């Protein structure tokens, strides 16, 4: 759902990134920010053209790896990755994509996408896997692409570091009930069966989901 409120900070990966993995942001209409030298430096070389959700990821030294609007995946040279088109996020989904590195892996990253709730599947949550060893180290989307987790999600999703400091919980609410779906991502892969929790009132269709730094609380901002 399109909103006339620019909350670009919330377009980006919404979990505690270690080291410098969140130091470069791409968002909006060809906009970006580089935080590697302390003060932010504006970037104008990005390829995104989106009013809402987007995500970027760097390596541990703050070097850009790739970024996405949930539909197209761009490598560090701003070219579309092999198999990097047709992901099932949406330019009018508030949290169209988040990126999570697979625990204990050097090359594999999960892109979790959320569709616009007004599309056919009503905000389907899907994931695709990027392998950074492909295309000469620039990365590519693997055959594990647009794997459905569940339908009827609101346009909210977040990732929370597990208490073991290695794994992640991927959390997203439905928009028709107060049910939150939580999937565990480990070095083995993503759990197929979610943990379901009914919490509070039914969330609004759009908005943002954010975890506290210690991972003990989440907040849903409705729009």
Question: How would you describe each model-predicted region?
Answer:
Residues 1-23:
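Bacterial Sec-dependent N-terminal signal peptides
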Residues 12, 59-62, 176, 185-187:
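Short acidic-glycine loop/turn motifs at beta-strand connectors
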Residues 19, 49-61, 88-107, 149-167, ...:
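Structural signature of eukaryotic scaffold interfaces centered on beta-propeller domains
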Residues 20-94, 101-104, 114-140, 165-223:
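Beta-propeller domains
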Residues 26, 65-66, 110-112, 169-171, ...:
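Structural core positions within WD40/WD-like beta-propeller blades
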Residues 40, 142-146, 190-196:
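Predominantly a core beta-strand signature of beta-propeller blades
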Residues 120-169, 173-174, 198-199:
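Asp-box/WD-like beta-propeller blade repeats and closely related beta-sheet repeat scaffolds
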């Amino acid at each position: 759902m399109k909103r006339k409120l620019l909350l670009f900070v919330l377009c980006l990966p919404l979990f505690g990134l270690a080291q410098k993995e969140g130091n470069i942001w791409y968002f909006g209409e060809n906009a970006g920010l580089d935080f590697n030298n302390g003060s932010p430096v504006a970037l104008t070389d990005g390829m995104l053209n989106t009013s809402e959700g987007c995500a970027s990821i760097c390596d541990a030294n703050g070097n850009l790896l790739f970024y996405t609007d949930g539909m197209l995946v761009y490598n560090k040279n701003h070219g579309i990755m092999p198999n990097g088109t047709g992901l099932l996020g949406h330019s009018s989904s508030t949290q169209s994509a988040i990126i999570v590195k697979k625990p204990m892996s050097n090359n594999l990253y999960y892109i979790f996408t959320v569709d616009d709730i007004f599309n056919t599947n009503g905000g389907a949550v899907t994931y695709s896997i990027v392998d950074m060893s492909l295309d000469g180290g620039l990365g590519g989307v693997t055959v594990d692409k647009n794997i459905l987790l569940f339908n009827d999600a609101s346009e909210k999703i977040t990732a929370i570091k597990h208490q073991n400091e290695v794994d992640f919980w991927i959390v997203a609410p439905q928009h028709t009930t107060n049910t939150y779906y939580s999937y565990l991502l480990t070095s083995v892969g993503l759990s197929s069966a979610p943990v379901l929790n009914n919490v509070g009132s039914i969330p609004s269709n759009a908005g943002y989901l954010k975890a506290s730094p210690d991972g003990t609380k989440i907040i849903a901002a409705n729009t």
